[in-house]
Amino acid sequence: MTPAHPSAPAPSPNLALNQLVDRRRARGESLVHLAFGEARLPVLPQLAATLAAGASRAAYGPVAGAEDVRTEVAGYFTRRRQPTTADQVVVAPGSKPLLMALQLTVPGDVLLPSPAWNTYAPQARYAGKRVYGVPVPAECGGVPAPDALRTVLREARAAGGDPRLLILTLPDNPTGTLAPPALVRELGALAREEDLVVVADEIYRDIVHDPDRTPFLSPAEVAPERTVVTSGLSKTLGLGGWRIGVARFPAGDTGERLRDGVIAVASELWSTLAGPMQHVAAYAYAEPPEITDRVRAAARLHGAVARAVHRIAVDAGAACRPPTAGFYVYPDFEPLRARLAARGITDSASLAGALLDGSGLVVLGGHLLGDDPKALRFKAATSLLYGDEEQQAAALAADDPTRLPHIAGELDRIAKGFARLLD
């Protein structure tokens, strides 16, 4: 596979599309926004009160985060079968800067599942790394197919590359699926065999739709000595604008070296997470009942709406993995290629353009996610279909949120937009 080389900075495509939607809506256009993975939910009153109570935390604190905060985060990971001490934790203004700091800290090139979240590859390039995309298996996204990973490693090294960092997303953005435990075990063994550092982005972990039927195994349980886990509160609690991220580093020398490297980068970039946000983090990661109740309700809502969009895509003739976590679906319109080609739709860019121009549906084309640009795939984020704050609250409480008029109306527009592709 030909690696991608460093290039000039460009705006993040999902953020650029989000701003495009704002501009066009300001001009009076009616758009269905499926291109931005924001968990649009009302802020819990207890979170707002905690933020206000933390206003007096105005001084600079430790770069890694205050000890009380890191202790609560350590407890969160320990409750998820990842025994953790406060010294293994770093908190930051979102998980995105932590991922960038890891790219700057871990030597060598980067291996990514293809497709993948659109931020990993640009960060790697800014860090001067080559990026090697590896196809995902048929059953899920977020992880590379093991045989394909072995092939890419062999070919990259033969060509002079030095892949040492493997980034996984569990559950996955963009496919809304979760790698099964057997596959995670195989990849953990492969990472150990090939001496790869693993970064497991687990920011969607707590919004698996049905955790009793969808078991979660972290790479940190399989290869604990080489796995860094990142997470945050943006997806589970709808706090994207508050920018609270965390990282858990392995115990032992490797983990200490990686943690110290990230802290060094942090000291030059963000200094410390804002004090009031640390106050929020300590409260949220302690997981009092009101937090866990909200997360469960959010997972039910995300699951119901994502499954509805999945059904619409399949009914339209697309192939699509059933979503099991988060709020994404990743339809593949390859079965309709001949009919779409007759309308000038031959790749993901023209497919996304046709949906926008013909139906006001804003999606993120697969070519922006490291996927084959000739494929007819795109990501649809379903979490902005919940309406205004009052409607969001109603959706969280509803037995079937897809029957609420404001959500049903958006789903109907999506179905008509997909059908219009073939008119």
What are these regions (language model features)?
Residues T2-P93, P137, E287, Y386-E389, ...:
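N-terminal small-domain helix-loop-helix segment of the aminotransferase-like
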Residues L104-L168:
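PLP-dependent aminotransferase-like
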Residues L112, G133, V198-A200, V363-G365:
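Hydrophobic residues in well-ordered beta-strands that form the structural core
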Residues G141-T214:
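Active-site phosphate-binding strand-loop segment of PLP-dependent enzymes
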Residues A299-R307, V314, C320-R339:
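Conserved glycine-rich beta-strand-loop-beta hairpin in the small C-terminal domain of fold type I
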